[in-house]
Swiss-Prot record:
Catalytic activity annotation: tRNA(Glu) + L-glutamate + ATP = L-glutamyl-tRNA(Glu) + AMP + diphosphate
GO BP terms in the entry: glutamyl-tRNA aminoacylation
PROSITE patterns: AA_TRNA_LIGASE_I
EC numbers for this chain: 6.1.1.17
Family annotation (CDD domains): GluRS_core (cd00808)
Motif ('KMSKS' region): 238-242
Name of protein: Glutamate--tRNA ligase 1
Length: 463
């Protein structure tokens, strides 16, 4: 088997979004699984629309998710001399030609064709032009598309694709200012980089016959193509920012783990048996682009959150502390190692994202300044006050390093007072955490420690 070489080639006209990252992941997995090469190419020939910030953000996103590319990043804007060389080669071999048609002439032609209910297209009027070029017109360069031939290729996702060249006009490969066009530079670079397999979105499917025309004209080897359907939202519509089509780095800010995001995106359009959770090693072992689905996949926040929660639960305390650094939350320095472990172990089970985990840390470590109203209103204050006073005294004599001792202290109150557990636990929870839900009470007492627990009960009794 020959060396597999893939690439990801974004345009830096905007930030890397979720669909682009999925394409990059598919290319990365296929190359790495076969001990091949994976390249990153920045398609920045459209100088008027390029953004340095967007290009840097793409590189930053790659670093975050751990997609390591081979070699240097290739920037197309630095390769104009190479493109000019190949444009001249096509001109010299009479496989391309200068077209002097003005914009006004082209617009007029299109209007005439529309009036005749024909598909607007260039009419090849300069294809075999031998006369004197009109003055004042900077020509474009067009490729001579072979006439009445069938271009066919076996797409790894879509199957057999056939297009008659009569449906393709002599398209422009160099603009009037000399800059090369998208289809031309993509073909040149894929060939010169030795790309064997092109995995990309199916919005590029219509470009492929044009690129094959160029491969053949330049006697380049044609790569294998895999055109992946787009990602839709859960209503079956194109992704919007609200539904997930946002900058990849926003997911880091929202508290998603890179392992969860890679796992989630790899499963959008690809599957292996009925597995949902994949380590990177498993993805490398089982991914094959031939298994990509031919129908669109749906972006599900529920599935992403479920996966993220799974990966969050499997992080150690030390790993969580590193991951939490970008987020703001209460100071942890007063907690001893056992309290810190208990806090994060308890909260990671109840959190779906790092951002949510940071908020829950605040909910535990920040003393309540108000209490959940609907829970507070249900309390029998005549019963609650003496119970908490008694428990406060019991806590003063309890070993806070022993969670079972804390649990026994709570049960002792319930047994001695002959009351239902909820009649005591609910007001205690409200006193400690300010609300009716949250982590277990023995965990809360252990994490807060003796002084803070008693202080919170006293504050509650004042209210």
């Amino acid at each position: 088997m020959s060396l597999i070489v893939t690439r990801f080639a974004p345009s830096p006209t905007g930030y890397l979004h979720i669909g682009g990252l999925r394409t990059a992941i598919f290319n990365y997995l296929f190359a790495r699984a076969n001990q091949g090469k994976f390249f990153l190419r920045i398609e920045d020939t459209d100088l008027s629309r390029n953004s340095i910030e967007a290009a840097n953000a793409i590189v930053e996103a790659f670093k975050w998710v751990g997609l390591e590319h081979d070699g240097e990043i290739l920037y197309q804007s630095k390769r104009f001399e190479i493109y000019k060389e190949y444009i001249q080669k096509l001109l010299d071999e009479d496989k391309a030609y200068y077209c002097y048609m003005s914009k006004e002439e082209l617009d007029a032609l299109r209007e005439e064709q529309k009036a005749r209910k024909e598909t607007p297209r260039y009419d090849n009027r300069y294809r075999d032009f031998k006369g004197t070029p009109p003055k004042g017109i900077e020509p474009v360069v067009r490729i001579k598309v072979p006439q009445n031939e069938v271009i066919g290729f076996n797409d790894g996702v879509k199957g057999e694709v056939k297009v008659n060249t009569n449906e393709i006009d002599d398209f422009i490969i160099a603009r009037s200012d000399g800059t090369p066009t998208y289809n031309f530079v993509v073909t040149i670079d894929d060939a010169l980089m030795g790309i064997t397999d092109v995995i990309r979105g199916d919005d590029h499917l219509s470009n492929t016959p044009k690129q094959i025309v160029l491969y053949k004209a330049l006697n380049f080897k044609i790569p294998n193509f895999f055109h992946v359907p787009m990602i839709l939202n859960e209503e079956g519509q194109k992704l919007s920012k609200r539904h997930g089509a946002t900058n990849v780095m926003d997911y880091q800010e929202m508290g998603y783990l890179k392992e969860a995001l890679v796992n989630f995106l790899a499963r959008l359009g690809w599957s292996y048996q009925d597995k949902e959770v994949f380590s990177m090693q498993e993805l490398l072992e089982w991914f094959n682009p031939k298994d990509l689905n031919s129908s669109p996949s749906c972006f599900s926040w529920h599935k992403l959150n479920w996966l993220n929660a799974h990966y969050l639960k499997n992080q150690s305390v030390q790993e969580l502390l590193k991951l939490l650094k970008p987020f703001s939350f209460s100071d942890l320095s007063h907690l001893n190692p056992a309290q810190l472990d208990r806090l994060l172990d308890a909260l990671k089970e109840r959190s779906q994202t790092l951002k949510e985990l940071a908020l829950k840390i605040d909910e535990v470590l920040t003393a309540p300044i108000e209490y959940e109203e609907k829970v507070f209103k249900k309390l029998n204050q005549a019963l609650v006050m003496p119970l908490l006073e008694k428990f406060k005294l019991a806590l003063d004599k309890t070993d806070f390093n022993d969670e079972s001792a804390l649990e026994n202290a709570m049960h002792q109150i319930i047994e001695e007072e002959k009351i239902k557990a909820g009649h005591f636990m609910q007001p205690l929870r409200l006193a400690l955490l300010g609300k009716g839900g949250g982590i277990g009470l023995k965990e809360a007492l252990f994490i807060l420690g003796k002084a803070e627990s008693i202080k919170r009960i006293e504050e509650f009794l004042k209210n």
